[in-house]
Amino acid sequence: MNFYDFSAVKMNGETVSMSDYKGKVVIVVNTASKCGFTPQFEGLEKLYETYKDQGLEILGFPCNQFANQDAGENTEINEFCQLNYGVTFTMFQKIKVNGKEAHPLYQFLKKEAKGALSGTIKWNFTKFLIDRDGQVIERFAPKTEPEEMEEEIKKLL
């Protein structure tokens, strides 16, 4: 299995295969609208705007598993991200990232990202960096600001 074997549902209800992102550098991030890390949407959007023409994609996955910080409906979440942070990168429908009902993509990401943080998602805005071949290169903690990932991203572009 690799990253390209999975699919997810975008905010508009369209099912998208991760294979659509072959040849791209991808950041996968679990998001929340009412979290102390929510302002990271700005940094993620800045990275996307700066590097999208060089092959960067950012995939946002709202999740309500951490202190009920994304309790809204998908349409509310999408509007919030666009209106408050100008998000233009792809946002998917709300998922679970931990437990028996965790989305298969997140089950894969947690298994592939080695190190002390592997096995579970601890909080919102955990970020996974995936290379152009679909390999999980690095996992970044929620406190890691998007701009701190820039050098790693540039190496992969």
UniProtKB/Swiss-Prot annotation:
Q: Which InterPro entries match?
A: Glutathione_peroxidase, GPX_AS, GPX_CS, Thioredoxin-like_sf, Thioredoxin_domain
KW Disulfide bond (keyword) present: no
**Protein name in the entry:** Glutathione peroxidase
A Gene Ontology biological process term: cellular response to oxidative stress
Give the GO molecular function terms.
glutathione peroxidase activity
Q: Which UniProt keywords apply?
A: Oxidoreductase, Peroxidase
Concerning its family, UniProt says: Belongs to the glutathione peroxidase family.
Catalytic residues identified in the record = 35
Catalysed reaction, written as an equation: 2 glutathione + H2O2 = glutathione disulfide + 2 H2O
The record's EC number reads 1.11.1.9
- In its keyword annotation, does this UniProt entry include Oxidoreductase? yes
Q: Which domain of life is it from?
A: Bacteria
Q: Name one Pfam family in it.
A: GSHPx
